[in-house]
């Protein structure tokens, strides 16, 4: 159990059998009445976000996740399949759980799969991924007075804004937290 006063972004709690990731936690002490904690949480099972208010000092169940490094094999559209490279055991995750990270997954990529009580509940992709640009408009010299950007479609289907000098076939590094171009790799 953890006090609501100790809730911070990144902590995972179990409320009535459902896992939530704390996105924001704001401690409020009004002039009149007792203090409370306003929390924005993301439901791990489907990615939906809710806001909830707890009394200060109230106890909630903290969930500790086990993390195992696994290899991403493939997706059949609805489900994503991962394999433990030591035991060759395969785990399948639904598209609901994968909604915010699926655009960064490339076959063969190593990711951390999170387990709670033996059941896979989510994944962590690397902070930076290197992906090939498969479609972008050619950058024309003299288009802008200062550096501009253009959309580029990557091999995974993700679309990111890149500098004008990026061409099709270039390998770029992307920050998966923000979805932003970092640098050209090759």
From Swiss-Prot:
GO cellular component: cytoplasm
Superkingdom field: Bacteria
Matches recorded under SUPFAM superfamilies: Nucleic acid-binding proteins, Translation proteins SH3-like domain
Primary location group: cytoplasm
Stored SMART domains: EFP, Elong-fact-P_C
Coiled coil: none
Classification via Gene3D superfamilies: 2.30.30.30, Nucleic acid-binding proteins
Protein's name according to its UniProt entry: Elongation factor P
UniProt organism field: Coprothermobacter proteolyticus (strain ATCC 35245 / DSM 5265 / OCM 4 / BT)
Lineage: Bacteria, Pseudomonadati, Coprothermobacterota, Coprothermobacteria, Coprothermobacterales
């Amino acid at each position: 159990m953890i006090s609501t006063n100790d809730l911070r972004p990144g902590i995972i709690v179990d409320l009535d059998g459902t896992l939530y990731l704390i996105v924001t936690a704001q401690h409020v002490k009004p002039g009149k009445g007792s203090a409370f904690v306003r929390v924005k949480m993301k439901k791990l099972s489907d990615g939906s976000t809710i806001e909830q208010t707890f009394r200060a000092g109230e106890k909630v169940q903290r969930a500790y996740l086990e993390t195992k490094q696994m290899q991403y094999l493939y997706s059949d559209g609805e489900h994503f399949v991962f394999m433990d490279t030591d035991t060759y055991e395969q785990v399948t995750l639904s598209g609901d759980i994968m909604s915010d990270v699926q655009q960064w997954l490339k076959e063969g990529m190593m990711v951390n799969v999170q387990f709670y009580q033996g059941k896979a509940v989510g994944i962590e992709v690397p902070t930076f991924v290197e992906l090939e640009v498969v479609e972008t408009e050619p950058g024309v010299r003299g288009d802008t007075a200062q550096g501009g950007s253009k959309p580029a479609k990557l091999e995974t289907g993700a679309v990111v804004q890149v500098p004008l000098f990026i061409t099709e076939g270039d390998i770029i590094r992307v920050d998966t937290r923000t979805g932003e171009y970092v640098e050209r790799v090759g």
